[in-house]
Each structure stands twice: as structure tokens, then as C-alpha cells.
Design a protein with these regions (language model features):
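Sec-dependent signal peptide recognition
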Residues: 2-7
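C-terminal motif of bacterial Sec signal peptides marking the signal peptidase cleavage site
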Residues: 13-15
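N-terminal, active-site-proximal structural segment of metallo-dependent hydrolase catalytic domains
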Residues: 17-175, 202-220, 236-240, 255, ...
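Structural recognition of the beta-strand scaffold that forms the well-ordered cores
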Residues: 50-53, 90-95, 128-131, 173-177, ...
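Short, solvent-exposed loop/turn segments at secondary-structure junctions
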Residues: 58-59, 99, 136, 181, ...
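Metal-dependent phosphoesterases centered on the DNase I-like endonuclease/exonuclease/phosphatase
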Residues: 119, 128, 241, 248-339
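Flexible, glycine-/basic-rich loop-and-beta segments that form/coincide
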Residues: 181-193
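Metal-dependent phosphoester/phosphodiester hydrolase catalytic core
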Residues: 192-279
Length: 339
């Protein structure tokens, strides 16, 4: 079944508690100022449903830093909340929102920022949200940048993580929803190995024509720099699979272009997920294998760090999704400078 549309780098393609303590889908949070109003759209099957994606840059270089920022009336967070209150999407992906295992940052942002009027906008309440661990900042124990040492300080430490980051959870993701989230149908692919992707773009060292990664490292390297999530949203029109990710920028490397190759393959993963052919390799973090059923409705969203025309990415990277037969073909919203 074909679904939504797209922009370039920031992409939108439309086509309770977990048993895992690190994964949370909150329901009806205890709002600070007022009880959330009734959501008429939950009982209406005729109303349009609005999905959105937003890179918030709500991150800190320090572990727990975002929680401390939000606890101290952060000006940037208030401005971001005002934008969300003005646009009022039903389902929203926030990229670059630091993950913490207790969900404190998400709770504070929901209650103290979205749940209170910002810049004259009406407060907005999301009864459901989803957070889960990401690969950024999780040390791999490998010398992934080939500088002769494992870990270190600053960027050296970040480069040797499974996804670039200075602490686990940096640059994470957060999904907000007006509708319930079905955790049994929700999937994550944080641990999927890059080597298992068919036709993976294995980086080469151009100076030696040898593989950039040592064989033992390539065998352990994860594909997703943050994570890939299939979040099952129970809308009045039925389940919609919210396919969200934040591929690594195709820069900050060297002539081997290891980040360009990874960006290409992180985006390719969604193309393979939509194809759903010969997917015995495509196993989620619960070890359930397979792609998206052909009759499933979906939205693909995220900061893809890729453009079909410009930029530093591998040519054709975004076309893997834009030209996919399951993706709807109609004009995406646009504005000068994507503002």
C-alpha cells in the first residue's frame, strides 16, 4: 500500500510499559498544569491525521545534561515547544533529543514545556510517547577511526562508539503521539549488523585498497548510527507504522567515506524493509525477522542527512526511498530554505 511524501534531509514519507525496561511507551502522563483535553480525533475516522518530524538539537555533551537544561527553564526548549504548539501535529518524531533510561527528559519536556503555553501558543498534550536506547555514544571497544587507539577523549571517543556520541543516548529520538502505541507490534533494529545488509557498501582505504575496517570489527559493527524504529501507532484509521531513524551525516570522516557509505546503507535499510523480500537477515532486537507486510500503512520520517540533488552523500542515496514503488508520488510541502 502506497503512503506519504518527502522533503530532502528532513524526511517525511507517508505510504503502558514494555517488558524491556529500557523501552517505554508512556500513557496519560501526570501533567503539571492541567489534565489533557479529550482527543476527538481518537473517535473520528474521517479527520486527517498529521505526522511531522523535527530535529530539535536538544542534546548535551554531558551525560544527563539535557535533564539539567530542561529543569532550568531552557530558552531553546521553550522555542521548540512553541513551534510544536503552533503546528500541532498528531504524531511527531523529535530527532536529537537525548535518551535517558528513566525518561526524565521526555517527561519534563512534555509537562513543563509542551504542557504549558509558550509564546502565546495553546498548550498541547501528547498522552503517549515512545523512547528507546540508541547506538550513539555506546562504546564499541574497537578502533573504528583507525587512529591507533580505542576510545580516548572528545571526538576520538565519539568516533569509536557504535554511533558518534560522547555519552550513551546523545542525539537520541523521541516519538510523541495523540494515539496509543502498540508495543507488541513495535520493532527496533539497533543491533542489526551492517555486514548483514545485502550489498552493504563496505568502506575501503583508498591509500591501500584494503578494507577500512578490520575483519573482526566489521563482523561486530552495527548498521544504525542511532536506531531504526517501526513504531506502531493505533490511529482511528488503523495501525500506521511510523518508520523513524536519523542516519549518520555523510561527512566527518576521510577519503574512505565510511560515513557516506553508512548513511547510504542506513537509508537502504528502509528500502529493504519495504521490499520485504528474502529478509531472513532482517531481524529486529527481539530476533523477529522480516520486513513490512505489503498491506501495511506507513510513514517514514527522520533527519536523513541526505539530499537527492545536493550535498556530500553517495549519489542516489535518497532515491532509494523517493523512487520506491510503495512510496506515494506527490509534491511535498516546501519553502525557501526549508524554513
Amino acid at each position: 500500500m502506497k503512503q506519504l511524501v518527502c522533503t530532502a534531509s528532513l524526511l517525511l514519507l507517508i505510504g503502558c510499559q514494555s517488558t524491556d525496561p529500557d523501552i517505554r511507551a508512556m500513557t496519560k502522563p501526570d501533567f503539571a498544569d492541567a489534565a489533557p483535553p479529550a482527543i476527538d480525533s481518537q473517535t473520528s475516522s474521517t479527520r486527517d491525521i498529521r505526522f511531522a518530524t523535527y530535529n530539535t538539537s536538544l542534546y548535551s555533551d554531558d551525560d544527563g545534561g539535557l535533564v539539567r537544561r530542561l529543569e532550568n527553564d531552557d530558552a531553546s526548549a521553550r522555542k521548540i515547544a512553541a513551534v510544536i504548539q503552533h503546528q500541532r501535529p498528531d504524531v511527531l518524531l523529535l530527532n536529537e533529543f537525548d535518551y535517558d533510561a528513566n525518561g526524565m527528559a521526555a517527561d519534563i519536556f512534555l509537562k513543563q514545556y509542551l504542557g504549558r503555553s509558550q509564546d502565546g501558543q495553546e498548550a498541547i498534550f501528547y498522552p503517549y510517547h515512545y523512547i528507546a536506547p540508541v547506538n550513539t555514544g555506546v562504546q564499541s571497544g574497537m578502533d573504528l577511526d583507525n587512529n591507533g587507539k580505542i576510545g580516548g577523549d572528545g571526538r576520538d571517543r565519539g568516533n569509536d562508539a557504535f554511533g558518534y556520541g560522547l555519552h550513551p543516548g546523545q542525539y537520541g529520538m523521541l516519538v510523541l503521539s495523540q494515539f496509543p502505541i502498540d508495543l507488541d507490534k513495535t520493532r527496533t533494529f539497533r543491533n542489526l549488523l551492517w555486514k548483514d545488509l545485502p550489498g552493504a557498501m563496505k568502506p575501503k582505504n583508498p591509500a591501500t585498497s584494503q578494507d577500512w575496517y578490520k575483519p573482526a570489527d566489521w563482523a561486530r559493527l552495527r548498521l544504525s548510527s542511532k536506531s531504526h524504529w517501526d513504531v506502531a501507532i493505533e490511529t482511528p484509521k488503523g495501525i500506521v507504522h511510523f518508520l523513524v531513524s536519523h542516519p549518520t551525516p555523510p561527512v566527518f570522516d576521510g577519503p574512505e567515506d565510511r560515513n557516506g557509505a553508512r548513511n547510504h546503507d542506513e537509508i537502504k535499510l528502509w528500502s529493504e524493509y519495504l521490499d520485504n523480500k528474502n529478509t531472513q537477515w532482517l531481524c529486529d532486537d527481539k530476533n523477529i525477522c522480516g520486513g513490512l507486510p505489503s498491506d501495511a500503512r506507513f510513514v517514514i520520517a527522520g533527519d536523513m542527512n541526505s539530499d537527492p540533488v545536493d550535498g556530500d552523500g553517495v549519489p542516489g542515496t535518497m532515491l532509494q526511498l523517493l523512487d520506491h514503488p510503495r512510496v506515494s508520488k506527490y509534491a511535498a510541502p516546501r519553502s525557501d530554505g526549508a524554513a
